Amino acid sequence: MARIAGINIPDHKHTVIALTAIFGIGKTRSKAICAETGIAENVKISELSEEQIDILREAVGKFVVEGDLRREITLSIKRLMDLGCYRGLRHRRGLPVRGQRTKTNARTRKGPRKPIKK
């Protein structure tokens, strides 16, 4: 198993799909990395040489991925909450942030129904 950005990349998958195992790299970015490095998209990770894996490591290293990206997202949400802006308040209350209706839906964000106590 190749190890890129602290993640074990699955050997039995094609390069494009295997790179998506890294948090912060989707299919589009994965295809761009393969095009930039000159590695074919349909080659399996197990068939790559050690030099090609090193080239992939360098290409992935240019992006903010994994722990750094998670930390960046958490800090930006925390910043919104500290500012006290509308989006921050919605995050703090655990409600939808992007203008969705909450009268009937939003069960995922609000959690299970709480019965009214009499």
UniProtKB/Swiss-Prot annotation:
A single BP term in Gene Ontology: translation
Origin superkingdom: Bacteria
Pfam families referenced in this protein's UniProt entry, alphabetically: Ribosomal_S13 (PF00416)
Any one GO molecular-function label of the UniProt entry: tRNA binding
GO cellular component, one term: small ribosomal subunit
Region Disordered, residue ranges: 94-118
Record key words, sorted: Ribonucleoprotein, Ribosomal protein, RNA-binding, rRNA-binding, tRNA-binding
Known partners and oligomeric status: Part of the 30S ribosomal subunit. Forms a loose heterodimer with protein S19. Forms two bridges to the 50S subunit in the 70S ribosome.
Family to which the UniProt record says this protein belongs: Belongs to the universal ribosomal protein uS13 family.
HAMAP family: Ribosomal_uS13
Job of this protein: Located at the top of the head of the 30S subunit, it contacts several helices of the 16S rRNA. In the 70S ribosome it contacts the 23S rRNA (bridge B1a) and protein L5 of the 50S subunit (bridge B1b), connecting the 2 subunits; these bridges are implicated in subunit movement. Contacts the tRNAs in the A and P-sites.
Protein name, as recorded: Small ribosomal subunit protein uS13
Organism: Klebsiella pneumoniae subsp. pneumoniae (strain ATCC 700721 / MGH 78578)
Annotated gene: rpsM
